[in-house]
Curated annotation (Swiss-Prot):
Annotated compartments: Nucleus
Biological role: Substrate targeting component of a cullin-RING-based E3 ubiquitin-protein ligase complex RTT101(MMS1-MMS22). RTT101(MMS1-MMS22) promotes fork progression through damaged DNA or natural pause sites by stabilizing replication proteins like the replication fork-pausing complex (FPC) and leading-strand polymerase at stalled replication forks. RTT101(MMS1-MMS22) ubiquitinates the acetylated histones H3K56ac-H4 at lysine residues H3K121, H3K122 and H3K125.
GO cellular component, one term: Cul8-RING ubiquitin ligase complex
Source taxon at top rank: Eukaryota
Protein family (similarity comment): Belongs to the MMS22 family.
Source organism per UniProt: Saccharomyces cerevisiae (strain ATCC 204508 / S288c) (Baker's yeast)
Protein name in UniProt: E3 ubiquitin-protein ligase substrate receptor MMS22
Region (Required for interaction with MMS1) residue spans: 1201-1454
Ranges where the record places region Disordered: 159-178
Length: 1454
C-alpha cells in the first residue's frame, strides 16, 4: 500500500446519520494511523458525520479492548504527526513471516518492502492482565478493582473453557463462535480455560489476582493474555494493560474528525497495483479463523455495552431483539429451500448474514438497525463490459477466502479485506443443475440494475448455511445500443458449437425473425449511457477508536447497486484504466493520467516519467524489446498495458506512434510465426496497441491530415488483427477466452470512437474471412448493410456448413437480405460439384425428397437444400436467373443426389420466378430414358429414378396450373413410353402418380390437349396389359373429363372406336362407352335412338342389360319416351325367367324412370315375390296403355305355365289380378277369356264393364254427371244397391275414362249445395250429398290418402264448401250420418295437408260457425251451376220415389 500517493480521502466506518450512531467503545486516538489527505470535500463529509455525533456524547467510556489510551486530544482539522517507527522496525519477524507466506501462495511480493515501510503502528501498547475471569461492569469513574461491588451476577456459558491456540503457527485453525442473548440487566462474564502454555506466560506478570478475560475487539475475540501475538511485543502489551487498569476513564462527549477506524480512499490508484498490495495487507491482520471463541459467548462482549449504556438503551435493544427474531426466524426456516439463482437480479440491499458453523452453534439475534455495516462505493461500476457473471456451485459456498482477514461485525466486513477468489462460470445459465460443463471465465461481472450511484454492502466471513437473500431470480437488464451488440451467446456458443451441424435447426423465412437474446456483453455506447463518472479509489481500513451500529438507509435501500464481482486478481482489473481512457477520449471526461509508472519485467525495472520525457521513448523501446525477445507473464503484460494506456493520455508525444507501431508490427509478426501456439493474451496485446494508436492520434500536436492517416492505419491494423486471428483461430480457441473477449471489446470501442465502421467493413470485404471470423465481425461491428463479401466460401463440407450457419444468423438476427452476389457465389460452388451432395450427408441425401407440392418447404438440412431456401428469399434478375439454371446433362456416373438436386432447383426457380422450365426439365430427363443408362442401374435404382421424375412432373404440372402456363407434357408421354410401360413391376407407383395426375388435370383451367394426344398411344398400350388395368382406368378418367377439350371429331375417330372394341369385355368399359356416347349425342354426332339401335352391343345378355340400364340413366326425357316401349318389351320377355342382377337393376331403372314408385329390386326367391313383381309390371304396362305388351306378357305366362316354370296357383292369382285391374284392356282377349273359364275365375267384373260402357256412351261431362246422378238416385230408392253402385263409381277413379275423376266428382258435390233454397225437402239434398261424401272417403281409403297436388286441390274445394254449408245450413247439422261422413272427410283432408301451408287455413275453415259473418250461399262456376240444375231436375222428377224409400226415411230420422 503506497502511503505517499496523493489525494487520500477519509471515509468513516459507517455512513450513518448522527442519530443512528451509538458510541460503544472509543479507544485512545492515535494520529499515526492518519494519512495525508488532499481531497478536502470527501474528508469534510466524513468528518461532519462523525463530529456531529461525537458532540452529543462528550465522555469516553472505558475500553474493553487490549489497547486503551485515555489521553487523547481530538481536533477538528487535519493533524500531522512526526515521523514514527515503521512496521518493519517494530515487527520484523511478523512481516518476514507474512512475506514468506505470500511468496508460497504465489503473490507478487516485489512491492512488499515499500508497503511494510509505509505502515504505522499505535504508539501505546497494552499490558497483559493476569486474570482468569474479567467482569464487565457498568462504567464508572472508579478503577476496575473498585467496580466489583456494582457488578451483576454473571451468566456463565455452557462450556466453561475453550482450548487456546498457538497463533504464531502457520496452520489454519477453524474457529468456533457461538453467541446467545441473556438478560440485558445482567453482567456478562466471558471465561476460558487456561492452557499450560498460558500459565507459564503469565507467571512473570504482577496481575495474578485478575481473571483471564476475553474481549471483542473489531469483531474479533481476543484473550487479554495472548492477544498480543502477531500484533505487539509482549512487553508493550502488558504495559498497555497496566496503564488501562490504573487509568481513570471518564465518560465524555468528544468531537472526532480524522481518527483511527476511518477508511481512507486513495485516489487514482492503479487497480492492478492496488490488488497486489491489498493481498499483502490482508495478512497483516490476523485472520479470525485462527482464534478460539468460547461457545455461547455473551452478546455484550460483541456489542460492547456496559451497564450504563444498557440502562440508557434498554428500549432500543428490546426493539433490536424483536426485529431480528422476526426477521431471521423466517430466514432460518426458508434457508433449506431457497436456492442461489444466478439468472436473478441482485436486490440492491445490504447483506445481513449470520454465520452458522454447525448444529451445535447458537446464533444470537442482533437488531437490524444496530448492525455494523461498512459501505464502500464500488470502484468498478464504470467498467465498459456489462456481463452477467456465473458462479459455480462450489464457489458459491466459499466466495470469501478462508485466508482472508475477517471481522465478526455480525457478518459484515470491508471488501478490501477479502482476498478475491477465482470464480468459475459455465456456459449454461442453469449451471447449478449440471455437474460438469465447460468453464468460462469472465473478468468483469457487471450488474447495472440502476443508473444512480450507490453503495454496496460487503458480506464477511464464510458462507453461512443460510442463503443470502440477495440471490436473485430476475434476469439482468441492460441498456441496449443500436446496431451494436456483442453477445456472449455468439462469443461463447457460436464460436464453439453453433457453426457445427445441427440437425434440429433449419433456416427460417426472412419474415419470421428470431427473438434476440439479451446480450451478455453490452456495447460501448450503452456503457457510456449508464456509467457514472469514473473514480478509481482504493479504500483502506485501519483500527478504529469508535464502533457504531448503523441503521439501514431506507430511502436508498431498494436502489443499492451491486455493480461488479471479482474473479482473479490478474484479470479482474484490466479494463478499469482502459475504460477510463475511452471515456476521456469519447466523452471528454476529465482524467488525470499518472505522471509516472514503474514496471518490473524479469530482472529489470523500468520507470517512465513525464518529468523525464526524453527517456520515455528509450525506456519503451527497451520494454518492447524485452517483450519481443524474452517475453513476460500474462499478468505482467496486462499490468504493463493498462499502465501504459493510462500514461499515454495527454502525453502529447506523437513520435511514440512509430515506436509503438514498430513494436506492434514485430509483435504481430512473432504471433504469426507462433500460429499453433498463439494465445488470447497475444491478441489482447495487439488490441491494446490499437487503443494506444487511438490515444496518440488524439494528441494536440497531431494535424488533421496526420490524424486521418493514423485512423486509416488503425483500420488496417484491425483488419490485420482478424486476418491473424483467422490463421491462429484453432489454437486460440483451446485457451481461456477472457483476454480475447477483452480485445474484441477494445476494438469495438475504438471503431466507435473514430466513427469509421463502414470504412472498416469496406476493408473487411477485400479480405474475405472464414465463417467463424465473419461471425465475430458481425457481432463486434454490427451493421445492417449487407456485407456478404466478407464471407469466404469454400467447397468443403465443414466450411460450407459453417458458412450457411453464418448466413442464417445474418438473415435472422442482422436483418441482412439475400443478394444476387451471394446466390451466384454459392451457385458456382455447387456447379463445380455438379450439384451432388457431400459424402458426409449420405444418410440425409438418401432420404431427400422432390419438392411436391412446389409450395412446400424442404425439411432436410442438406447443404443444397439450404441453398434452395436462400433462393426463395432473394429477388434475382432475369439474367442472374438464367445463370443459375442448371444446363448440363446428367452423366452415367452421377449419383441420385445430382438428379434430386437439379430437379429441386428447377422446381424452386419455376415456383419463385416467372419462368417456364418445362423444356429444360424435358432436356434434363432425356438422358435417363436411354437403354444404356437404365441398364447401368439396378431395378431398385430405376424404380427410384422413375418415382423422382413422376414427382417432379407433378410439381411442374402444379406450377403450370397455378401460373396458368401452357403445358405440353411431352416429358410425361416419354415417361410412360420409356419407363412406365417398360417396368410392369412399378404399377403401384404408377397408380399413385395417376391419382395425383388426374386430380391436378381436373383443376387446370387450361388443359393441355397436346399432352393428352401424346399420351393416347400409351393409353392404348396400357390397355393391353392386365397389370396396368387400374392405372389405365385412372388415366382414362383424365380423357373422360377432358372430352370437351379433345373435341367430338377426335373423340369419335379415336377414343369412341377404341372403347367400343373393349366394351364387350367389362362393365367398366361399358360405362365409359356410354359416357363417350352421351358426349357425342350431346355434340350432335348422333341421337340416342341411333346410339341404342345401331351402336348397341352384341355381347352377352349381362352386358346388354348393363348397357340398357346406362341408356336409361343417360338419355333425356324425349329420347326415353321413344326408347321406353322397346325397353318394356325387353323386360316383359325376361321378367318371369331371369335371375340376373343386371336384369333387376335394369328393371328398377326402367320403372323409376317411368315414375313407378318401387324400391330397388333384387332377384326373387319364391313365386310370391315374383307374383308381386308381375303385378307391378302389369300396372306399369296398363299405365302406359301398352295393351299389346300386356297381352304378350299374358301369353308368356301361359307358355311358362305349360313348360312348368310357373305353377297353376301362380297363374290363377295373376288372372284374378288381371280380371280385377286390367279387365277393360283384356275383356276382348280370347286367351284371357279362355284362361278365366279354365281356371274358374268369376265373371262379376263383367257388370263393371257394362257400367263403364254405359258411362262412356253418355258423352260429355254433363251427360256423364246426369248418368251418375240418376244411377245414385235409383240405387238409393232400391235400398241394397247403393254400396255396389258406389264401388262402380270408385272404379272411375282408377280408370282412364275420366281425365280428372276428383275434379268431376268435386264439382258434382258442390252442385248439391244449391245457391238458392229449393222447393223440395232439403233433407233429400243432404241424403244424396252424404253418399257422395262416402264415395270420397272410400276412394281416399283405397288410395291410402296418397293424392297428387291437383287432386288435393279438388279435395280442398269440397272441404271449403262443406265447412261453409255446415255453418250456414241448420238442417245440415241435424243428421248424424251426414255429420259423421263429413267429419271423416275433413279429418282425411287435414291429414293429407299436415306439414303444408294449407293445413292452417283448412283448420280455420273447420272452426266456422253461424255467429261469424259468412255468406249464405257459395258462388258456383258455370259448370257447377249447370250441374246444380241437372241435380234439381233429377230430384224433382224422382222426389216421390225418394221420399217413399226406406233408406231416406231412415236417414231423415237419424
Amino acid at each position: 500500500m503506497d502511503v505517499d500517493e496523493p489525494n487520500p480521502i477519509v471515509i468513516s466506518d459507517s455512513e450513518a446519520t448522527d442519530e443512528e450512531i451509538s458510541i460503544i467503545y472509543e479507544p485512545e486516538f492515535n494520529e499515526n494511523y492518519l494519512w495525508a489527505e488532499e481531497n478536502v470535500q470527501e474528508a469534510s463529509r466524513s468528518q461532519k458525520i462523525v463530529t456531529e455525533r461525537l458532540s452529543l456524547d462528550s465522555t469516553a467510556g472505558e475500553s474493553c479492548t487490549p489497547s486503551v489510551v485515555t489521553d487523547t486530544q481530538v481536533t477538528t482539522g487535519l493533524r500531522w504527526s512526526l515521523r514514527k517507527r515503521k512496521a518493519i522496525q517494530k515487527m520484523p519477524y511478523s512481516l518476514e513471516r507474512i512475506k514468506h507466506r505470500q511468496l508460497l501462495e504465489g503473490y507478487d511480493i516485489s512491492s512488499f518492502d515499500s508497503i511494510s515501510n509505509q505502515l504505522t503502528l499505535p504508539k501505546n501498547a497494552s499490558t497483559v492482565i493476569h486474570s482468569n475471569d474479567i467482569l464487565l461492569t457498568k462504567r464508572t469513574g472508579k478503577p476496575l478493582d473498585e467496580q466489583k461491588d456494582v457488578t451483576i451476577d454473571s451468566i456463565k456459558p455452557e462450556n466453561s473453557s475453550v482450548q487456546s491456540q498457538r497463533y504464531d503457527s502457520d496452520e489454519e485453525i477453524p474457529k468456533k463462535r457461538h453467541r446467545t442473548f441473556k438478560d440485558l440487566d445482567q453482567d456478562i462474564v466471558f471465561q476460558s480455560g487456561d492452557s499450560t502454555e498460558d500459565e507459564q506466560d503469565l507467571a512473570s506478570t504482577n496481575l495474578q489476582n485478575t481473571q483471564n478475560d476475553e474481549v471483542i475487539f473489531r469483531g474479533r475475540v481476543l484473550n487479554v493474555r495472548t492477544g498480543y501475538r502477531g500484533v505487539l511485543p509482549r512487553v508493550a502489551w502488558e504495559k498497555s494493560l497496566q496503564k488501562q487498569q490504573s487509568s481513570k476513564v471518564t465518560k465524555r462527549k468528544t468531537q472526532l474528525l480524522n481518527h483511527k477506524g476511518v477508511a481512507k480512499r486513495k485516489m487514482n490508484r492503479s487497480a492492478h497495483i492496488e490488488d497486489e498490495e491489498q493481498n499483502l495487507l490482508n495478512d497483516l491482520i490476523a485472520p479470525d479463523d485462527e482464534l478460539d471463541i468460547e461457545e455461547n459467548a455473551p452478546p455484550d462482549i460483541y456489542l460492547g455495552n456496559l451497564p450504563e449504556d444498557r440502562e440508557a438503551n434498554e428500549k432500543e435493544l428490546k426493539e433490536l431483539q424483536e426485529y431480528y427474531e422476526s426477521k431471521y426466524s423466517e430466514d432460518a426456516q426458508s434457508a433449506g429451500t431457497s436456492g442461489f439463482n444466478l439468472n436473478e437480479e441482485y436486490r440492491n440491499e445490504p447483506v445481513y448474514e449470520l454465520e452458522y458453523d454447525g448444529p451445535g452453534s447458537c446464533i444470537s439475534h442482533v437488531s437490524y438497525k444496530d448492525q455494523p455495516i461498512i459501505y464502500l462505493n464500488s470502484r468498478h461500476s464504470d467498467s465498459g463490459f456489462s456481463e452477467q457473471y456465473n458462479i459455480s456451485a462450489e464457489d458459491n459456498q466459499s466466495v470469501i477466502s478462508l485466508d482472508a482477514a475477517e471481522e465478526h461485525n455480525d457478518g459484515i466486513i470491508d471488501k478490501m479485506l477479502v482476498k478475491p477468489k477465482r470464480i468459475k462460470a459455465t456456459n449454461d445459465a442453469n449451471f447449478l443443475n449440471t455437474k460438469s460443463k465447460r468453464v468460462r471465465r469472465y473478468k468483469y461481472k457487471y450488474r447495472n440494475s440502476c443508473l444512480a450511484p450507490s453503495t454496496k454492502a460487503i458480506k464477511v466471513g464464510k458462507r453461512s448455511a443460510h442463503k443470502s437473500h440477495l440471490a436473485a431470480n430476475n434476469p439482468v437488464s441492460f441498456v441496449s445500443k443500436k446496431n451494436h451488440v456483442i453477445d456472449d451467446y455468439f462469443f461463447e456458443e457460436l464460436e464453439s458449437q453453433s457453426l457445427e451441424q445441427d440437425d434440429s435447426s433449419s433456416l427460417k423465412p426472412q419474415k419470421k425473425r428470431r427473438k434476440k437474446k439479451a446480450p451478455i456483453y453490452s456495447s460501448f455506447s450503452a456503457d457510456l449511457e449508464s456509467r457514472r463518472k469514473p473514480v478509481f479509489n482504493t479504500v483502506v481500513e485501519v483500527p478504529t477508536n469508535r464502533y457504531a451500529f448503523t441503521k439501514p438507509n431506507v430511502r436508498n435501500r431498494d436502489s443499492i447497486n451491486h455493480d461488479m464481482e471479482f474473479e482473479e486478481e490478474d484479470s479482474n482489473q484490466e479494463l478499469g484504466p482502459i475504460m477510463v481512457v475511452l471515456d476521456s477520449i469519447l466523452l471528454k471526461k476529465p482524467f488525470e493520467p499518472p505522471n509516472f509508472f514503474k514496471i518490473q519485467l524479469s530482472d529489470k525495472s523500468f520507470l517512465l516519467s513525464k518529468l523525464n520525457p526524453a527517456d520515455i521513448a528509450t525506456s519503451l523501446q527497451k520494454i518492447f524489446r524485452v517483450i519481443i525477445d524474452k517475453g513476460i507473464t500474462d499478468t505482467e503484460l496486462v499490468h504493463f498495458n493498462e499502465s501504459l494506456i493510462a500514461f499515454l493520455v495527454h502525453l502529447d508525444m506523437p513520435e511514440l506512434f512509430d515506436l509503438i507501431g514498430e513494436f506492434h508490427r514485430e509483435f504481430r509478426s512473432k504471433v504469426n510465426s507462433l500460429r499453433k501456439k498463439a494465445k488470447p493474451i497475444h491478441f489482447f496485446q495487439i488490441a491494446a496497441c490499437q487503443l494506444m494508436f487511438l490515444e496518440i492520434s488524439r494528441y494536440n500536436k497531431i494535424s488533421a491530415a496526420a490524424k486521418f492517416d493514423m485512423d486509416v492505419k488503425l483500420l488496417d491494423h484491425i483488419v490485420s488483427f482478424f486476418k491473424l486471428l483467422s490463421v491462429c483461430y484453432d489454437s486460440v480457441m483451446k485457451n481461456p477466452m477472457q483476454y480475447l473477449y477483452t480485445s474484441y471489446y477494445i476494438l469495438s470501442a475504438v471503431v466507435d470512437v473514430i466513427h469509421k465502421k463502414e470504412a472498416l467493413w469496406d476493408l473487411f470485404q477485400k479480405h474475405p474471412f472464414s465463417p467463424h471470423i465473419s461471425l465475430l465481425l458481425v457481432n463486434i461491428f454490427p451493421t445492417k448493410v449487407c456485407r456478404w463479401q466478407v464471407l469466404r466460401l469454400d467447397s468443403e463440407f465443414q466450411p460450407l456448413s459453417s458458412a450457411f450457419r453464418f448466413i442464417n444468423y445474418c438473415i435472422e438476427t442482422c436483418n441482412w437480405n439475400v443478394t444476387n452476389s451471394l446466390i451466384l457465389s454459392l451457385d458456382r460452388i455447387f456447379k463445380r460439384r455438379r450439384f451432388s451432395d457431400f459424402e458426409e450427408e449420405s444418410d440425409l441425401s438418401q432420404n431427400n425428397k422432390i419438392i411436391y407440392p412446389p409450395t412446400n418447404q424442404l425439411t432436410s438440412r442438406l447443404m443444397f437444400n439450404r441453398y434452395l431456401h436462400l433462393l426463395t428469399l432473394c429477388e434475382l434478375s432475369s439474367s442472374d436467373t438464367q445463370r443459375v439454371i442448371p444446363m448440363g446433362d446428367i452423366s452415367m456416373n452421377d449419383s441420385l443426389s445430382v438428379l434430386k438436386n437439379r430437379l429441386n432447383l428447377l422446381i424452386v426457380l419455376a415456383t419463385r420466378f416467372d419462368l417456364n422450365l418445362e423444356k429444360r426439365f424435358q432436356e434434363l430427363t432425356r438422358p435417363l430414358y436411354s437403354k444404356e443408362y437404365l441398364n447401368l442401374h439396378t431395378q431398385n435404382t430405376v424404380r427410384t429414378i422413375t418415382t423422382l421424375i413422376m414427382q417432379a412432373s407433378l410439381s411442374f404440372l402444379e406450377i403450370s396450373r397455378i401460373k396458368n402456363h401452357p403445358f405440353s407434357g411431352k416429358f410425361i408421354a416419354s415417361l410412360f413410353d420409356k419407363l412406365v410401360l417398360q417396368q410392369p413391376s412399378i404399377s403401384g407407383v404408377t397408380e399413385n402418380f395417376l391419382k395425383e395426375f388426374t386430380n391436378l388435370v381436373s383443376k387446370m383451367k387450361r388443359k393441355s390437349v397436346s399432352m393428352l394426344k401424346f399420351l393416347y398411344p400409351s393409353l392404348v398400350a396400357m390397355s393391353q396389359e392386365n397389370i396396368f388395368e387400374s392405372s389405365f382406368f385412372l388415366l382414362l378418367q383424365v380423357y373422360l373429363k377432358s372430352l370437351d377439350v379433345l373435341g367430338p371429331t377426335w373423340v369419335q375417330n379415336y377414343l369412341f372406336q377404341f372403347i367400343k372394341s373393349k366394351a364387350q369385355e367389362n362393365e367398366r368399359w361399358i360405362e365409359c362407352y356410354c359416357q363417350i356416347g352421351k358426349f357425342l349425342v350431346d355434340s350432335g354426332i348422333f341421337t340416342w335412338w341411333t346410339f341404342f339401335t345401331y351402336n348397341g352391343l352384341d355381347a352377352a345378355l349381362h352386358f346388354q342389360l348393363a348397357f340398357h340400364s346406362l341408356i336409361i340413366d343417360f338419355c333425356d326425357t324425349d329420347s326415353f319416351e321413344l326408347l321406353k316401349k322397346p325397353l318394356y318389351s325387353i323386360a316383359s320377355d325376361l321378367l318371369l325367367i331371369s335371375k340376373d342382377d343386371a336384369f333387376y337393376h335394369f328393371l328398377s331403372n326402367l320403372l323409376k324412370r317411368a315414375h313407378i314408385i318401387v324400391a330397388d329390386l333384387k332377384p326373387v326367391s319364391d313365386e310370391n315375390e315374383l307374383l308381386r313383381l308381375a303385378y307391378i309390371f302389369s300396372k306399369a304396362l296398363k299405365k302406359n296403355a301398352y295393351q299389346d305388351l300386356l297381352a304378350v306378357f299374358l301369353s308368356l305366362a301361359k307358355k311358362h305355365y305349360d313348360e312348368g316354370d310357373i305353377s297353376r296357383n301362380f297363374l290363377a292369382k295373376y288372372l284374378e289380378f288381371l280380371n280385377k285391374n286390367c279387365l277393360t284392356e283384356l275383356r276382348n282377349n280370347q286367351l284371357f277369356i279362355s284362361l278365366r273359364r279354365e281356371l274358374g275365375i268369376s265373371s262379376d267384373e263383367d257388370e263393371k264393364c257394362a257400367f263403364w260402357d254405359s258411362f262412356n256412351e253418355a258423352g260429355d261431362i254433363l251427360s256423364k254427371a246426369a248418368f251418375v246422378e240418376t244411377g245414385i238416385v235409383q240405387a238409393c230408392c232400391t235400398g241394397n244397391e247403393i254400396d255396389g253402385y258406389l264401388d262402380n263409381l270408385s272404379t272411375l277413379f282408377t280408370s282412364t275414362m275420366l281425365e280428372s275423376p276428383f275434379a268431376f266428382f268435386s264439382d258434382l258435390v258442390i252442385a248439391h249445395i244449391f245457391e238458392n233454397r229449393p222447393f223440395f225437402d232439403v233433407n233429400i239434398k243432404n241424403f244424396l250429398l252424404s253418399h257422395f261424401i262416402d264415395l270420397f272417403n272410400k276412394v281416399l281409403k283405397m288410395k291410402f290418402e296418397q293424392v297428387s297436388p291437383d287432386e288435393f286441390a279438388e279435395l280442398c274445394k269440397v272441404y271449403r264448401a262443406l265447412c261453409i254449408e255446415c255453418a250456414t245450413d241448420d238442417t245440415f247439422n241435424s243428421n248424424s250420418d251426414l255429420i259423421a261422413a263429413k267429419d271423416a272427410f275433413l279429418v282425411s283432408v287435414l291429414r293429407i295437408a299436415d306439414g303444408f301451408w294449407e293445413h292452417d287455413k283448412l283448420l280455420q275453415l273447420r272452426m266456422l260457425d253461424s255467429n261469424m259473418n259468412i255468406p249464405n250461399q257459395i258462388p258456383h262456376t258455370t259448370l257447377q251451376s249447370s250441374l246444380s240444375a241437372i241435380v234439381i231436375k233429377i230430384i224433382e222428377s224422382n222426389i216421390g220415389k225418394i221420399e217413399a224409400s226406406e233408406p231416406f226415411k231412415t236417414f231423415k230420422n237419424t
